[in-house]
């Protein structure tokens, strides 16, 4: 089973449909972990633990704001070495999961490159050769989409990739089966071989 954090939006819990399709494609069962509030929710950790201990992988999707459940799940995955893919907002959370810094302290977009674009491909990223992302894709430069409003300026974890304007585009937690954060949205570029490789590697690590 693969856990996916839902995004609270009033009376609706949203989950990207492309992620559900991809999880099903790889023969896994998606388990939605649904917050009931958008940020400072108080929740029963014992109930969440019962869900998390049965998961082989976790996906932290993009969104506009995370909940306290997000923070708990990210730390749980790191501490228990559960494979985890953190996308956009999830990547931003991964970058500060060793602190109590909130989203407002992340850096707003302020560069010449369009980091919040509706284009299929928004810009290039440059991948460090000694990184997990390079091990997966085996390329030093690829094109990605981009829809994030915040840059990463904290350096928790190993930096895997940058944009040409110097902002962090991917990071990993070392010495784990698979914990990778990306600022782009691979689920929306699944027809791109580079994005498929990310999911291939993630789901292989979940076996």
Feature locations, PLM:
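A glycine-rich beta-turn/hairpin centered on an aromatic-Pro dipeptide
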Residues: 145-153
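Active-site-proximal beta-strand elements of phosphoester/diester hydrolases
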Residues: 180-184
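N-terminal beta1-alpha1 cap of cysteine-dependent amidohydrolase-like domains
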Residues: 1-89, 96-97, 107-136, 140, ...
